[in-house]
């Protein structure tokens, strides 16, 4: 496993010890000041009932480390994602009921290299709406939990 590109902001993969993790949309486990860069753990804010004002520069409100509507992903995380995608032999995507534009762009990167993509989803995605020209893309309609159990059984601790 080269790594995991995560598009969730819950931070659960990191909390559970995932290695080689790129949290493309950030996570809500820490807040930061966009003026001076000071950061603070979310748990400290909750436990101490701290204000969201920056304790360092006193000029800004702390915000979670996630992109908001209209903001781009961090460029270094995008670069790391592209490097990982350009090195992988297989791309496995766990999807709910849709594929985001960034996910589709990741599939395109892997598809151009003639590598395999498996899209695991418990609900039926309308694969006809996607313009995937390759036969290297498979939709697997199974729960993510069952598929993960199969991966863990096959690869053990090498998954994370």
Question: What does each model-found stretch correspond to?
Answer:
Residues 1-160:
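Conserved catalytic alpha/beta core of Sir2/sirtuin-type deacylases, generalized to analogous enzyme cores
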